[in-house]
Amino acid sequence: TAGAQQAISIGLMATLAMGDKILVEEPGYRQVHKIIDLLRLDLDGVSVREKVGLDIEKVLSSNAKALYVTPSNQYPMGTTLNTEQRLKLIDWANQHQSWIIEDDYDSEFQFAHRPYTSMQGLAGKLGFDDRIIYVGSLSKVMFNGLRLGYLVVPESLVAKCLEIKDALTGDTVSHTQEALADFVRE
């Protein structure tokens, strides 16, 4: 995709309908609010506190259709969800047939501990990854002007996400992708 923001947009468009409730970290990534407003989704903020992190109990008691979360390095608070918290959220999504949009923002930069397995990876090990959309960006790890993002979706959403991507922008610039592939190979 043309960056993580486009990947988030595609994921939300593929899974939610106007009026659906989505839980979003507060404070959090402000650009996601613009996407939610544009799609006319019902935004419900979930507090993120210093050192404590996301209010997991609010999520677990919600009947929202989706949760947008940055579990590895929450922006802007910098908190991280541990494995137990991630598993609780995965269980919530499966029980409620809700979606988790996991924005793996800055997960490569961990200084206090080893990186945790992504929620999408954990769910896959349990056979429950059909409710998680994993979003990433190469802009943070490579260089900001790259504007290449990606999303990993359940098989059931691949065709719909490709259709949305094609309708929005057609192909992502292939020479940028090819240059990155050459860089990675070297």
Could you describe each region identified by the protein language model?
Residues 1-97, 101, 108-109, 114-127, ...:
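Conserved core of the PLP fold type I
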Residues 131-186:
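PLP-dependent aminotransferase class I/II
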